[in-house]
Amino acid sequence: MDKMNPDIVIPVKGLPLGESSFRFEIGEPFFQAFENGQIKDADCSIRVRVVRHQTLLDIVCEIVGFVVVECDRCLEDLTLKVDTEPHLTVGFGTVDVDDAGVEDDVLVIDHTESELNLNQFVYDYICLSLPLVKVHPEGKCNPEMLRYITDNEGTETSAEGETSRPFEGLKELLKNKDN
């Protein structure tokens, strides 16, 4: 699969019992398909290992690569490493999870399905592998933006251009209470 064809699809029909392996490469076109995405660009390799049982598929996706996101501090591009290995269990038709011996969540698909699209699964796990706060290492942020943040720290400007102090009114209430 080339990075211009962003679908991660596993053929389910005709998949032999036992282990099968698939490789995919994803880049910017893959992430553009998702609205409101935080990932601007990427270069990731995905190795999908599928173990087919009689009524289940055990899927492991080894996702390794880099993604480009916006720095939360300076808004410049920030490249982050991705290295995650999510697991997914897929059942056919109506699978009784207790009988199958599976404790994790099971995605159930109709037994007539011929393929399984893993796009959303891969996208979600790449996003979950990213840190909550995405910032450059100390000293690597855009110095001009940091200067702007430092100069304007602690002040808010109202619509009229005046600097607002949200706790000023509370201080007045405390003064009046003491009197």
Spans of features found by a protein language model:
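Arginine residue identity/basic-tract feature
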Residues: R23, R47-R52, R73, K134, ...
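Short cysteine clusters
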Residues: C71-C74, C141
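Cys/His-rich microdomains that often coordinate metals
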Residues: L78
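Solvent-exposed beta-strand sheet faces enriched in polar/charged residues
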Residues: V60, K81-D83
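Charge-rich, low-complexity linker and terminal segments
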Residues: M1-L17, D43, D83, T89-N179
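Residues that cap or initiate secondary-structure elements
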Residues: E28-F30, Q54-L56, L75, D96, ...
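A positional/architectural concept
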Residues: M1-E70
